[in-house]
């Protein structure tokens, strides 16, 4: 994803920034992520490495949602689903990826509202 050590060597470590971000997760129904099992495992590993309790947030996987709602796509990668929905994406740029994921979740759940009840974990 083109992130090099020199890009981050002077940035704060996870343990220093998590307290600023963790309140954003409180009270939400779920966290949407494209390939949620990966994102959940990275978050858990970072929390464990920082000696912090593992988060219990519920995740909705937009890959699984996209497979359910748009089964005819050639694949269900973030850029493919985004293109299908007309979402502008700067692939592998965190803000753009997050916005695309949110838009996929919104549109997918609009079309399959029961998906969240059965698939948020």
Model-predicted segments: where are they?
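Acidic, divalent-metal-coordinating active-site segment for phosphoryl/phosphodiester hydrolysis
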Residues: 94-108
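Acidic two-metal-ion nuclease catalytic site recognized across multiple nuclease folds
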Residues: 104-121
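A short, structure-level motif marking secondary-structure boundaries and short turns
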Residues: 28-29, 62-65, 108
């Amino acid at each position: 994803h083109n992130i090099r050590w020199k890009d981050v060597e002077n940035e704060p470590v996870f343990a220093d920034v998590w307290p600023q971000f963790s309140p954003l997760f409180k009270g939400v129904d779920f966290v949407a992520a494209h390939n949620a099992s990966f994102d959940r495992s990275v978050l858990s590993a970072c929390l464990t490495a920082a000696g912090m309790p593992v988060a219990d947030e519920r995740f909705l996987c937009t890959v699984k949602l996209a497979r359910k709602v748009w089964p005819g796509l050639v694949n269900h990668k973030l850029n493919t689903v985004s293109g299908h929905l007309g979402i502008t994406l700067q692939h592998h740029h965190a803000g753009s990826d997050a916005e695309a994921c949110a838009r996929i979740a919104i549109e997918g759940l609009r079309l399959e509202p029961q998906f969240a009840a059965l698939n948020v974990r």
